[in-house]
């Protein structure tokens, strides 16, 4: 079977073009998000002058926090976008809620925001999970 079922015999019948376009758009979105995540966290956490081939403890911790915060913000933006799709933007309420939650976390846990709903995932795990997610698209 070829990439995304194009040009080959599909045993389940003809592919729905809308599903194909949706799958391609989703793949583009996930790839773009991953690339922006890597670029942003690499720029913030890893010094330009490499002294070692491995991450030190501070770099690893910084990357873990950066990834967790990135996904937390991405989730919140998605929630606001979904409300916008329903015609109920509620941006002011959402901003106040996010600000209040961040302030509460800062008071409870110190100056770094404790992301409560995002599991701490190591960067190599994100790469692995992304490849597992993308593998059906690239390797079928």
Curated annotation (Swiss-Prot):
It is found in: Mitochondrion inner membrane. It is a peripheral membrane protein. GO terms for biological process: protein insertion into mitochondrial inner membrane. Signal peptide: none annotated. Keywords: Chaperone, Disulfide bond, Membrane, Metal-binding, Mitochondrion, Mitochondrion inner membrane, Protein transport, Translocation, Transport, Zinc. GO terms for cellular component: mitochondrial inner membrane. Transmembrane segments: none annotated. Coiled coil: none annotated. One of its GO terms (molecular function) is metal ion binding. Disulfide bonds join 41-66, 45-62. InterPro entries: Tim10-like, Tim10-like_dom_sf. A motif (Twin CX3C motif) lies at residues 41-66. Pfam families: zf-Tim10_DDP. Heterohexamer; composed of 3 copies of TIM9 and 3 copies of TIM10, named soluble 70 kDa complex. Associates directly with the TIM22 complex, whose core is composed of TIM22 and TIM54. Interacts with the transmembrane regions of multi-pass transmembrane proteins in transit. The twin CX3C motif contains 4 conserved Cys residues that form 2 disulfide bonds in the mitochondrial intermembrane space. However, during the transit of TIM10 from cytoplasm into mitochondrion, the Cys residues probably coordinate zinc, thereby preventing folding and allowing its transfer across mitochondrial outer membrane. Belongs to the small Tim family. Mitochondrial intermembrane chaperone that participates in the import and insertion of multi-pass transmembrane proteins into the mitochondrial inner membrane. Also required for the transfer of beta-barrel precursors from the TOM complex to the sorting and assembly machinery (SAM complex) of the outer membrane. Acts as a chaperone-like protein that protects the hydrophobic precursors from aggregation and guide them through the mitochondrial intermembrane space. This is Mitochondrial import inner membrane translocase subunit TIM10.
